[in-house]
């Protein structure tokens, strides 16, 4: 495992759709390992996803979640079940959009709605079967993708996404634009572009694409799995709610990002969710850079390597009762998902570990804490917890196969 994640390997990047929508691998997630990638990643971490930067975006997360809580509290009738798949995706997407592009209304909001639609198409297209990805050495593989219309689909999606990014960058660089009180992600990227001569406009667009792919999908999927497990394990839900509500005792006060450091049991719930339901069960494929020998086996150069973190999280050699949702297993131990504990690697490890873990963890923990604090959650009438399907689906991101419908009741204390 150490060899695969930290040794002579690189991320396998011959993913046809991803290569196109990341402007020829000008991003972080899909770019090949080289000096240029190392420089971009260093800038990305220091400028965009550092702890200080995550803290600066807390206002947007608190505002977005606050709007959701108000909306759920005022819905009519109050006994109506809520589709959490749609609700949570819209929430996280709205937060990423607010952080990336700033406040939106009117025509801007309409254009963003179109962007959301095209982005959803992109995620579906990236999960489609591509002959080039599975048979990269066969000349006919690209012909097959063209024949079934996959290449044309990628191209259309790319052009629409690029058009939106170009419009946003132009608006932010307009000398007559009124600067907001807080810089959004595009402001930060433009500032970086002006300071760093090697950073191009395509780099900016590719990094924005990374933010949406990594931020929107993985966070909403993790939240859905967490709430699914909690509704099937009501004792765990009550324990998590008791911790949050004992901390936030003041009426009318909502959970704040600063509260998260004191919610130890909630963090165990998130760890246990990621152990059983990593957003990407197979990490982004890697390949060897050189011929190497591992445990007596010869591994040729350019060998593809797949890391099954889903299986690692359920390995009985590492975990007691591995199929059981039991957050208490993390009590009193320092196991985390930041890449140093190889039994729990939902976001990878080594030099290709996801650089945005702090932001993703904050989004998931804060949203989950807020929903558990403000509402009591029940299944619709006639539905038992045993009826809640835990079947998943997806090629790159593994999400619930069926929507999760729950009834939130406002907690009055």
Model-derived regions, located:
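Conserved cytochrome P450 K-helix/beta-meander segment immediately N-terminal to the heme-binding cysteine loop
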Residues: 307-335
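Cytochrome P450
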Residues: 52-63, 73-98, 106-115, 137-163, ...
């Amino acid at each position: 495992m150490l060899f695969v994640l930290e040794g002579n390997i690189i991320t396998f990047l011959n993913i046809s759709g991803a290569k196109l929508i990341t402007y020829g691998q000008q991003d972080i997630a899909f770019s090949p390992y080289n000096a240029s990638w190392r420089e971009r990643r260093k800038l990305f971490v220091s400028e965009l996803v550092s702890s200080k930067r995550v803290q600066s975006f807390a206002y947007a997360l608190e505002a977005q979640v606050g709007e959701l809580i108000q909306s759920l509290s005022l819905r009519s009738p109050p006994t109506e079940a809520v589709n959490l798949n749609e609700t949570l995706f819209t929430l996280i997407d709205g937060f990423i959009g607010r952080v990336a592009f700033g406040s939106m209304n009117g025509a801007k909001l309409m254009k963003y709605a179109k962007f959301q639609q095209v982005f959803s198409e992109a995620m579906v297209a990236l999960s489609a079967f591509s002959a080039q990805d599975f048979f990269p050495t066969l000349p006919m593989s690209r012909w097959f993708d063209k024949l079934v219309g996959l290449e044309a689909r990628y191209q259309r999606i790319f052009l629409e996404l690029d058009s939106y990014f170009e419009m946003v960058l132009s608006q932010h660089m307009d000398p007559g634009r009124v600067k907001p009180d807080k810089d959004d992600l595009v402001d930060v990227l433009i500032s970086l572009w002006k300071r760093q001569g090697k950073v191009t406009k395509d780099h900016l667009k590719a990094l924005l694409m990374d933010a949406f792919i990594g931020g929107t999908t993985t966070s909403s999927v993790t939240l859905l799995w967490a709430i699914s497990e909690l509704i099937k394990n009501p004792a765990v839900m009550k324990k998590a709610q008791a911790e949050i509500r004992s901390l936030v005792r003041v009426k009318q006060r909502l959970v704040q990002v600063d509260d998260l450091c004191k919610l130890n049991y909630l963090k165990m719930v998130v760890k246990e969710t990621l152990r059983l339901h990593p957003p990407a069960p197979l990490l982004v494929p890697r390949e060897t850079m050189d011929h190497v020998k591992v445990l007596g086996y010869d591994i040729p150069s350019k060998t593809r390597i797949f890391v099954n973190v889903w299986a690692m999280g359920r390995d009985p050699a590492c975990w007691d009762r591995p199929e059981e949702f039991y957050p208490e297993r993390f009590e009193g131990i320092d196991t985390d998902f930041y890449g140093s504990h190889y039994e729990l690697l939902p976001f990878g490890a080594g030099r290709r570990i996801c650089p945005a873990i702090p932001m993703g963890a904050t989004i998931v923990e804060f949203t989950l804490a807020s929903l558990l604090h403000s509402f009591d959650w029940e299944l619709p009438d006639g539905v038992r917890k045993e009826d809640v399907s835990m079947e998943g689906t997806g090629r790159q991101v593994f999400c619930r196969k069926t929507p999760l419908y729950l009834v939130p009741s406002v907690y009055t204390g």
